[in-house]
Amino acid sequence: MAEMAVTAALRPCSGVSPAVSGTSHRRRRPAAWRALAPPPPHAGLRLSSPAVRVPRAASSAAVEDGSSSNTDTVPTPKVIIDQDSDPDATIVEITLGDRLGDLLDTMNALKNLGLNVVKASVCLDSTGKHIKLAITKLSTGRKIGEPELLEAVRLTIINNMIQYHPEASSQLALGATFGPEPPTELVDVDIATHIDIYDDGPDRSLLVVETADRPGLLVDLVKIIDDINITVQSGEFDTEGLLAKAKFHVSYRGKPLIKALQQVLANSLRYFLRRPTTEEGSY
């Protein structure tokens, strides 16, 4: 597949964030986030993918064609990974006030993960500059299905953001891992963790999780859901500063989750999320 030449023009934002809001849960088009419960082979979301190396930016001194403004107020960094809006591509939206450039180095880092940016758009609103990337796998031309690779995309983008905008490091939980300056404030996991499950039509439920962010969180959430034989049909994973917000469309044997199963899922997630240092083998 030919590499895309990015020529996105600035425009006013219209419906920038395709996120499912906490008060409106309208059905979206069927997405291709592969199911996790024992489905047919073509629908399997693999959890055993080999570890993916997260490429780092080539230079921390460059600004990736963006603004390196060091004002007192650092905007909240946001990275949204959306598997709902486009049936053919994974949509990623990146925001850091008005400081981001064209992210060409970030797109090169994504290419090193075996991915292709097939479309890019840029828009402006009162919160700043929003860059959207439509991403597919180079090997298949299809959207990303593996949670490990989705997490690698998230970490790659955040790593590059911190490399080019080190002032964002203290605003991100992952700044303690990738950045020169860890967060100045710590999030109380017990207070920050919220888990809600809603009915979302005749064949699925909507799981909404908000908690303190940490590396590998997306993969951990998917694994916990899979361990209960619940299927993730599609979803979205947002990184907003020190917090992470997941919105997953889930089902059990093609049906919404009954109340008892909702409670099992919520308890399992809460147990894990409130023990961030728990090793996988002890769960």
Swiss-Prot record:
Instruction: Name the predominant localization.
Output: plastid
The UniProt keywords, alphabetically, are: Chloroplast, Plastid, Repeat, Transit peptide
In what residue span(s) does the ACT domain sit?
91-171, 206-276
Q: Which InterPro entries does the UniProt entry name for this protein? A: ACR1-12, ACT-like_dom_sf
Localization (cell): Plastid, Chloroplast
Q: Name one GO cellular component term.
A: chloroplast thylakoid membrane
Record's superkingdom? Eukaryota
Upregulation details from the record are:
Repressed by drought stress.
Asked whether the UniProt record includes Chloroplast among its keywords, one would answer: yes
- Give the transmembrane ranges: none
Q: Where is the transit peptide?
A: 1-56
Check the record and name the CDD domains matching this protein.
ACT_UUR-ACR-like
Region annotation (Disordered) ranges: 14-78
What PANTHER family does UniProt report for this protein, alphabetically? Answer: ACT DOMAIN-CONTAINING PROTEIN ACR11, ACT DOMAIN-CONTAINING PROTEIN ACR4-RELATED
Also noted in the record is: On the 2D-gel the determined pI of this unknown protein is: 4.7, its MW is: 36 kDa.
- By what name is this protein known? ACT domain-containing protein DS12, chloroplastic
